[in-house]
Amino acid sequence: MCNSSSEGKEWTKNYVYKYLRNVPNPKFLDIGTGQGTYFRMLNSGYPNAHWTGVEAYKPYIEKYRLMEQYHTMHNADATELYGKNINVSQLHYDVVFCGDVLEHMTKEKAVALVEKLTSCCGILIISIPIIKWPQHDDTNPFQIHVKDDWSHEEVLDSFHGVIDHSKGDSVGVYIVAGDRYIPKD
């Protein structure tokens, strides 16, 4: 969602700083950039980072000046990341953010996307509503919550490789180990 909940953001920031403490030039993939929340939250701590953004709703790219923030910006649906025009599996990212994205697709598509994303990253960070959270938007079709009833337990059961999490009142943040995960002390 464009106006992302602040719940779990500080925990996420601290987790990323700890995970990347010895990585001088990290690579980030931010799926569903919205306003660029994760970029704004972390960019000052990683001046040499490379940021790739993916945003399905083109007006957000213009409105929030995302082309000026991200080194690489794709106007694409998250489910199109493995097509002929964009294939993120051929790239490596230290951290992939999937914030407020998975509730906008069916459970089956969400599980498939997470499985694909873990093949190209160290960690995948999922931020998702864990209460019934219907959402409709007359101007942005990508804002509709297709699966609006995720629970904490269902997230843990559905996405394999969760190594840590922060459960809030309405939003959960889940760290999923990717194929390139390097355990930290």
Each model region followed by its residue ranges:
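Class I (Rossmann-like) S-adenosyl-L-methionine-dependent methyltransferase catalytic domain
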Residues: 1-88, 105-112, 116-119, 123-185
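Histidine-centered divalent metal-coordination motifs
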Residues: 100, 104
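A conserved beta-strand element that flanks and buttresses the S-adenosyl-L-methionine
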Residues: 97
